[in-house]
Amino acid sequence: MAHSTLELVDVEKSFGSVIANSGISVKVDSATVTCILGDNGAGKSTLIKTLSGVHKPSKGKYLVEGVEVDFNSPRDALDAGIATVFQDLATIPLMSIWRNFFIGNEIEKGFGPFKWLDVKKMKEITKQELLAMGIDLRDPNQNIGTLSGGERQAVAIARAVYFGAKVLILDEPTSALGVRQSGIVLKYVLAAKERGIAVIFITHNPNHAFLVGDRFYLLNRGKLVQSMERATADIDELTKAMAGGKDQIGRAHV
């Protein structure tokens, strides 16, 4: 029996007497886009931090390829192939695109104590990987701050894919972007899916989710209140579920 790439089983996260997430069960498969939707205060931020290894679940199971895991830090999650692109992107605006692409993972050449950065190779890889995602860079030396918000998201996605992500968690990647830039980001979400990555798309925008999603989970007040598969999902129903909020609690179907 094939296991999902990532699975949460009845996960709860509490902080003292405050329960931030409760009864969260989701499945995330390779080469699919799983959308987790919810308005402000729905519990998305806590769930992202649990998925990315910032928080440990208080209850329930976290499985990666069928094996229960216990992450102590985001580095543990990253080592397991779970990469997260947060809203702030963790890029340095005044640093070049290629330096941002390899920051913390620089390629060196030389031997023994005599080592230096292999700048040429890193520039070549940056161009190749971005081109594979459909981004034709003018110059990898340009500061990443000169790129649009959508293009910076694309660089962050390509970086995660190159460094071995099996699961890519995107935290509100289209938030605060215009129509054109949102379209650019959604294009690269699908490009990651086509490369076999299991994508988790966190958003409060049902229209953006419906354009790329294969599976949809709706959160409200920290609980999973509805789930849909692409084959049975309807944009109007998804939008109504988002707008209905508490009226949807207790309804779940696949």
Model regions and ranges:
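Glycine-rich phosphate-binding loops of nucleotide-dependent enzymes
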Residues: 2-251
